[in-house]
Curated annotation (Swiss-Prot):
Compositionally biased residues, Acidic residues: 54-64
Family (UniProt): Belongs to the DNA gyrase inhibitor YacG family.
Record text on cofactor binding: Binds 1 zinc ion.
Official protein name in the record: DNA gyrase inhibitor YacG
Origin species: Proteus mirabilis (strain HI4320)
Length: 71
């Protein structure tokens, strides 16, 4: 039998066995999973990019030049 892979929960650092017995892996529990999700949703975490600009800087709300009525 092979050795079981053990990882640390990204939220609380508790050791977690990486197999079917740990349904929230890599998290130790649903609570830690939701804490992490909340941090991503609040934009406390992000994936680093090479560019420093924010994607929203490139977005603009431009009104239509020639709106056409619906007929």
């Amino acid at each position: 039998m092979s050795e079981k892979l053990i990882v640390k929960c990204p939220t609380c650092r508790t050791e977690v066995i990486w197999d079917e017995s740990s349904p929230y892996r890599p998290f130790c529990c649903k609570r830690c999973q939701l804490i992490d999700l909340g941090e991503w949703a609040a934009e406390e975490k992000r994936i680093p990019s090479q560019s420093e600009s924010n994607d929203s800087d490139e977005w603009s709300e431009m009104p239509e030049q020639d709106p056409k009525p619906f007929n």
